[in-house]
C-alpha cells in the first residue's frame, strides 16, 4: 500500500520565480515523485534588471536562465538599490514582512502542507519561518519538517532576532555543495546551530538542488519519518 505523497511548499532563490524553480527541480521531482508533491510559489518583489551585482554576477550565472524573465526576491539587503547580496552586512532590509505575508496567504490558498523546502535566499527565508513557528509567533505555520538547500544566516542586523530565540526543533535537512561559489559551504554550516539535530546532505557540486541517484536514500530516509 503506497503512502500519500507529502505536500511540500517550495521557496525559490533570488532572481528566480516559482515557475523557473519548478523547472530547475525537475530531477528532484522525478527522484521523489512517489513520496512528495512539490508546490511552488513566487516572491512578491520583482527584482530590477541590474547589469552587475556583487553576488549577483555569480548567482545569475549559476541560477538564472533565459526563462527567468520575471525575476523575484524575498527581500533586499540594499534598500536603495533594491538588490540583494547574501554576504552584505546591513542594518535594515526591504520586503521581508510582505514575503512572510505571501507565505501565509499561500498556506491558506494552497495548503495544507506537511513541510517546506527553500533554495538559497529561499532557504534563508525558510529558516526565519521555522524560527517564527518555534517562537509561536505565527499560528498559521505548522511545518512538520524543513529542507534547506544552500541556506545561510541573514547578515542583516534586523534579522538577528530569528537566530536569538529558542533553538528550532522542527526536523531539518540541510543540503549544500562543497563547490558552491554563491553560498559557500561555511555559510550553510553557520546556520546549522539554529536547528536542533540538523541533518546534513553534503554534495560535491555547486549552487543547485542536487538530485543524483546517490542522494535518493538520504532524501527518502528523511521524508519517511513524516509519512
Curated annotation (Swiss-Prot):
Assigned EC number: 3.1.1.1
GO molecular function: hydrolase activity
Catalyzed chemical reaction(s): a carboxylic ester + H2O = an alcohol + a carboxylate + H(+)
Keywords: Hydrolase, Serine esterase
Coiled-coil annotated residue ranges, if any: none
GO cellular component terms attached to this protein's record: cytoplasm; nucleus
Pfam family, one: FSH1
Catalytic machinery residues: 120, 180, 207
InterPro entries for this protein: AB_hydrolase_fold, FSH-like_dom, LovG
Signal peptide: none
Family: Belongs to the LovG family.
Biological role: Exhibits ester hydrolase activity with a strong preference for long-chain alkyl ester substrates and high selectivity against a variety of short, branched, and substituted esters. Is able to hydrolyze ester bonds within a wide range of p-nitrophenyl derivatives (C2-C14) in vitro, with a strong preference toward substrates of >8 carbons.
Name of the protein: Esterase OVCA2
Organism field: Danio rerio (Zebrafish)
Gene: ovca2
